[in-house]
Amino acid sequence: MDYRFQRRLAAEILGVGESRIWISPDPELREEIEGAVTKADVRALIKRGVIKVLPEKGNAGHASKVRHLQRRKGRRRGMGRRKGVATARLDPKERWMHRIRKIRRYLRYLRDKQVIDRKTYRRLYMLAKGGTFRDLASLKRYMADRGLVPEEKIR
């Protein structure tokens, strides 16, 4: 029951892959199928429904849908699931907001306590806005290096 030749012809005729060709397993049709050696013979078998095209398989996607729903509920997001550094999972804008708010809060504190004047506050504020300071520590270093604030006033 070797129908490789007929399968190849049917695949050519129907324009699909050989794996999608279904040939009837009926033993009574065996000789007739084996005798089909021309494209015309195979076409006749296709017309009679002895040879058919199987539907495409495709990807089910069910597992990924279930995973997605679980993640929406907050599952599968624990420490053991995480790869990469913590900052890789943080939105860059979110990181920027945390950083700039901390720096601005500190600058406001210094201005309100009159440790720095309005002019210095404004200059440092604009530098912070421009991304000059990587974190609060770098702002404090900057102020200490330039003597903008006495050492003991930098808390």
From Swiss-Prot:
Pfam families named among the record's database cross-references: Ribosomal_L19e, Ribosomal_L19e_C
Reported function: Binds to the 23S rRNA.
Family membership noted in the UniProt record: Belongs to the eukaryotic ribosomal protein eL19 family.
Record's GO cellular component terms: cytosolic large ribosomal subunit
Subunit structure: Part of the 50S ribosomal subunit.
HAMAP family to which the protein is assigned, alphabetical: Ribosomal_eL19 (MF_01475)
GO biological process: translation
Compositional bias (Basic residues): 66-84
Organism per entry: Aeropyrum pernix (strain ATCC 700893 / DSM 11879 / JCM 9820 / NBRC 100138 / K1)
SUPFAM superfamilies per the UniProt record, alphabetical: Ribosomal protein L19 (L19e)
This protein's name: Large ribosomal subunit protein eL19
Region (Disordered): 66-85
GO molecular function: large ribosomal subunit rRNA binding; structural constituent of ribosome
Keywords on record: Ribonucleoprotein, Ribosomal protein, RNA-binding, rRNA-binding
